[in-house]
Amino acid sequence: MTNWINTVSRDHVEAGVRGRFTQANHGKPHMLRKMARGDWIVFYSPKTVYPDGEPLQAFTAIGQVADDEPYRAEMTPDFQPWRRKVDFLDCTQTPIRPLIDQLDFIEDKARWGYKFRFGVFKIDDHDLEVIRSAMTDS
């Protein structure tokens, strides 16, 4: 299994949790195709609302990929984003700042936000456990 972080505004994460899905990179399929059933995905939200919401800088959801392939959804006739089904855990929104020193994927602690510019990226099991334990009771 692989562990992922998906950088998404909180309003979009909330829509995904309600609908049990994720999108990535504005609906493009490339990174979703790299995911497999059972992979963990953590959602980091730099803002409350896309594109001009208030700064949030928190992990806002966590779950596991629950299908085998991306699928298309019709939002409007001109926008049919690719998605993956996700089984979300019950969790608590968790600010990132108290966790920065424990997270190995953040190599430069002074410029901790840089990695999130990639949108979707892999993390190791240690980092997943740091985040998951902060967000859940387990």
Curated annotation (Swiss-Prot):
Pfam families: EVE (PF01878)
InterPro entries reported in the protein's UniProt record: EVE_domain, PUA-like_sf, UPF0310
Superkingdom of the source species: Bacteria
SUPFAM superfamilies, per the entry: PUA domain-like
Family that this chain belongs to: Belongs to the UPF0310 family.
NCBIfam families recorded: PRK02268.1-1, PRK02268.1-2
Official protein name in the record: UPF0310 protein MAV_1800
